[in-house]
């Protein structure tokens, strides 16, 4: 595995470990579902990194043009859970904001790593791959931020960029 992919893989592995450990500490159903959804996406990222690494090891080439992450839409998954779960359950035990903040920091570090790797990429396909991972980490951050807004019920919700706010949580 090349150095950049190894760094990416290790970061995703640490994220998975963090999310699995964090889920067991949460008493809030929304936080727990969000954390498990993020853990699932970390596994998806690790699998894609491993797939690319295997291709590089075997042929010295990045795999074809298909580098995206299929079915990776955390907002859709959280929305489905949110809409089918009683408000009492969603609002129970809103004490996990510190866990959410730590997760947001982790996603920010992930974004920064992929931004750096994208800038140092040796090919267009490698750059696109790291840019896609950056986008994924940004989506993860937005998910965590929206859950944090929901849990803390801060007025900050309305001051943020509308494109990042899940207004359906506030209805």
Show the residue positions of the predicted features.
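Non-heme di-metal
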Residues: 1-171
């Amino acid at each position: 595995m090349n150095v950049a992919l190894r760094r990416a893989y290790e970061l995703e592995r640490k994220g998975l470990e963090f999310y699995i450990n964090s889920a067991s500490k949460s008493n809030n159903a929304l936080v727990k579902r969000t954390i498990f959804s993020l853990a699932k996406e970390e596994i998806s990222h690790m699998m894609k990194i491993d797939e690319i690494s295997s291709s590089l090891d075997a042929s010295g080439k990045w795999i074809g043009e298909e580098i995206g992450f299929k079915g990776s839409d955390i907002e859709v998954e959280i929305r489905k859970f949110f809409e089918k779960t009683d408000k009492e359950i969603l609002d129970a035990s809103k004490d996990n904001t510190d866990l959410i903040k730590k997760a947001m920091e982790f996603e920010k570090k992930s974004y920064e790593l992929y931004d750096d790797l994208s800038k140092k990429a040796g090919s267009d396909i490698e750059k696109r791959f790291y840019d896609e991972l950056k986008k994924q980490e940004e989506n993860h951050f937005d998910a965590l931020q929206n859950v944090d807004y929901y849990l803390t019920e801060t007025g900050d919700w309305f001051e943020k960029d509308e494109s990042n706010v899940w207004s359906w949580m506030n209805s």
